[in-house]
Amino acid sequence: MEKFELHILGCGSALPTTRHFATSQVVNLRDKLFMIDCGEGAQMQLRKSRLKFSRLNHIFISHLHGDHCFGLMGLISTFGLLGRTAELHIHSPKGLEELLTPMLNFFCHTLAYKVIFHEFDTRQTSVVYEDRSMTVTTIPLQHRIPCCGFLFAEKARPNHIIRDMVDFYKVPVYELNRIKNGSDYVTPEGEVIANTRLTRPSDPPRKYAYCSDTIFRPEIVKQLSGVDLLFHEATFAESELARAKETYHTTAAQAARIALEAGVRQLVIGHFSARYEDESILLKEASAVFPNTILAKENLCISL
């Protein structure tokens, strides 16, 4: 299967700690890089990951709290120092362009590349990015300010040609695209060769969903149905349920309930409160509900 990876750059929450960087991730699909949130220190973690800066052209910001976007200015500036010329696209809720433009004009007015902002409505489910390989769709969340998650969905690929069978039936090259897309082949003599004899199914398309920050929100279960990997914030343990509700965050057990009801393959929890020096209690509570749960940690790479 072709590369589809999630790199965790940071998994902490608002209060800085010596154990965790602020929230930031990178999705690597076939060596195209997509950043999700850009907390303080994201560019340092990006260097540690050994991912190529030049392959990062799109950044998706879930909401305008500092622990999810304070790293943007530093990253934009560093791109300039590295001689970047390719456009950088930043997808975010309304307001980020207004906030960053004065700083860009002051600190980064000599950039040799364009920073292009794309704003979306966090209340709507909408496709905010699409190419030949993938779509990125917003997931409406409920936080103290407008916020959404993101669903990265690989597009279905054509069937694989069985070379020996194609050669055996002497299928012309110009017929191969039709056959890949499901058509049968008719020989010059009129014999119909079933597509199933000439192809094998491609690998099933994969999906990754990112949900942070949000109060427990069962409404998202339908959109998350069957995803291969779900990152869901788990800021608090169940003992802090009242605090989670008050701050519009989620407990580890609640995140696991979302994963269970959505039928996801694997759950990774993160956005840990600074009060926890050991997140094992969060893993224990989540795993009791959804066993295939792991803790996010810096420099973790997960292959889908």
From Swiss-Prot:
Keywords noted in UniProt: Endonuclease, Hydrolase, Metal-binding, Nuclease, tRNA processing, Zinc
GO molecular function, one term: zinc ion binding
Reactions it catalyzes: Endonucleolytic cleavage of RNA, removing extra 3' nucleotides from tRNA precursor, generating 3' termini of tRNAs. A 3'-hydroxy group is left at the tRNA terminus and a 5'-phosphoryl group is left at the trailer molecule
UniProt key word Zinc: yes
Cofactor dependence: Zn(2+)
HAMAP family linked: RNase_Z_BN
Subunit structure: Homodimer.
Protein name: Ribonuclease Z
Origin species: Bacteroides fragilis (strain ATCC 25285 / DSM 2151 / CCUG 4856 / JCM 11019 / LMG 10263 / NCTC 9343 / Onslow / VPI 2553 / EN-2)
Classification lineage: Bacteria, Pseudomonadati, Bacteroidota, Bacteroidia, Bacteroidales
